[in-house]
Amino acid sequence: MNSNIEDDPWSSGWNDDNDNNNNNNTSINDPLTGATATTTPYQSSYLTSSQLFTSTGGGGSGSGGGYNSGVNTYNTTIPPNLINVPSSYETIYSHFITKYNNNNNNNNSNSTFTLNDFEINIIDKLISLNYLTNYQKQKILDIIYENNLLPINQSFKFYQILGLLALEIDVPGTGDYVTLQFRLNNNLPDLPEKFINEIINEENEQEEQTSGLLGNRNRSIQSHSHFGPNNQDDWNIDDSTTISGGGGGGGGNFGDPLLVDHSYIHDDLIDESRSVGGTQPQQGGGGGSGGGSGSGSGTIAPNVDSSYIEKYINDIKDQFKPLFSGIDLIKIKEVPEKEGIIFKHINYMITHDLKIGGTSSGTKKVIRRYSDFVWLMEYLLEKYPFRVIPGLPPKKFTGASPDSQFLQRRRRGLHRFLNQLIKHPILSQEPIVQSFLTVPTDLTTWKKQAKIDSSLEFKGQKIQTDFINVIWPIMGEPFLKKWRQAEENIQFIIDKWVKIIILVERYERRQQQISFDNGKFAEMLNGFSKLNTKIYPDNEDNNNSTRNDVNVNVVVVDNNENYKQDFDFNSSGDIININQCLNSIGEFFNKSSQVLIDESYIINTKTLEKFKNYLDYLNSLQELFERTKQLSINQIDLLDKRIKDQEIKFKKISEENPDIKGGELIKLRQSIINDKQEIFQQLNKDWLIKQCCLQEFIIFQETQFLITELWVEWCKDRLKCQEKLVGLYDNLNQEIIHDMPLER
């Protein structure tokens, strides 16, 4: 009745079984490739978290990887082709891609040319030739990640990165993204000729010493994951086909950094003895383990049994109760008066009896605007990007019909948003959420004097050793596989559920139409019974007509009394009995019409909302997948490679001539220490993200019972309706069988 979803799925071949081959299905956007996703004709018009975030300009980044709306990390625009590419760029690109393809052909591999290879073979070479400094290198790498200049093997992005390097070499400080775009296709500087010659004349031994162009990071990964037959390293397996790390491998990560397990790096940093003084990680340092005695993902504590893991899972699930159970925790209604001098807006009254935020028991009422809901969602996205956050209904529906219908749909969407928030075990404890539901004053005024901390939820936290050493070794592999499987299929599941909602709405509209038709039945039968005696005259009608005509009556009575008695057409009064039964049938249609109206109301206000509530959870999970791909990007592999290369260099210089190059050794040692501190911070964040996503995935499993709840109630409500209709049919049947004549 009030659907915001496309009405006719049949026109698009909606019942095809081959959903995976259907071009109408939406593919998951990949922020690393910049691929433009196709859209499905069944997209919900509800505002999802990523849509809201990308449409707003607010929200600074939290520590450790929060949202930063000013950074273009999810650019899916297909860029135009570069023209006037400097010849040096083409030389470099041709040189590396040719060697890359030849190496793939020789080794029968299908590995990917990564940014790590670019850094080793180009950026580090420029540093060794004193064209760039390490600070400038880090600045360029940050620009690459922030502006999505990946994957590196695309010529357009390869040339842009070379342009950044050339600009920085030409005039230090100008190697930024804005300057690059301004000078794109117009007068980009050439790379130094000396550098070009060095690259072209590079010897094979030097290429091997720096891990080579095709130095695949997963060679090291495979050596730690024991993946493959006979525990042999497979040098040709890349990230696109393998998830490796603690507990074994799983499917490809298709651009999702969450699916890369860095447990092997944690093992290296903890277990290997570093010869560079003072770089051994400390107990509980800001790194991935939180301690130096853990066994890592490769070893499972011998005393861990399945009951411990089951308790861990059940404890998380017990915190989340998504079922309605006939209770609305929070109610919301529109305040009749529209406020605003020029631009009118709707206020919403939120009512609840929740005891939250240290408030006393009793009913609480607060007034909020739609913009207040938007602010709350922006805050949650910034602080809890790795949580399942429900979406908001849009400010305005596309093609919204009557204003009252639009407002009703938006109010219901806000109602679902608040009830899903308050049922979430983490979000419900957020002070801002509690203040939103309890502060009686205007929220804009309250925000001016309130202290609001929007930094990432696990800022300053360290991952627990129990998670790394006990939970992850057992749950890591199956979780990554199930996460990937869910991420691949979530859009198809959403499409199916949207079509189910369409059918429910059609069923409701049909019940309304049947109710309308039943009313027409009663009206037409009543009119028919009043007129049918004109063609089926009975004895009573004949007597009435003779009394009204005195002259005729006199003649008839005096001269033709016997003939009059013989001339009656329907002396038995059958038409009267028939009309009385027709009136009973009309009453049946009126009563059944009311039953169908009641059923339609229940579907529209209760059943359909539960179907859409479950759809909201599906959309929220899909949004979590997309945010995780965007925000869990890290440089762990790059840092690990750089540390190992620097340690090799440190050892080599120490053995050759430590006295002469003492200053260089000090700088190198400090660089190693800095990189280790950075990698431990990034490992810690990576572990915390994985822990958070694992918890959310476990919590989401409880939503499966929403499917049971809504279909059980669907059946109960339909049964009640049918029982009422059957009772009406039975009474009508008994009446007309005995009272409606079939013959004289």
Swiss-Prot record:
How is the protein disposed in the membrane?
Peripheral membrane protein
SUPFAM superfamilies with a match to the protein in the record:
PX domain (SSF64268)
Q: Which Pfam families match?
A: PX, Snx8_BAR_dom
Q: Spell out the protein name for this chain.
A: Sorting nexin MVP1
Similarity section: Belongs to the sorting nexin family.
Which PROSITE patterns does this chain map to?
PX
Top-level taxonomy:
Eukaryota, Fungi, Dikarya, Ascomycota, Saccharomycotina
Give a GO molecular function annotation for the protein.
phosphatidylinositol-3-phosphate binding
Summary of the function given for this chain in its UniProt record: Required for vacuolar protein sorting.
Which residue windows does the record flag with biased composition (Gly residues)?
283-297
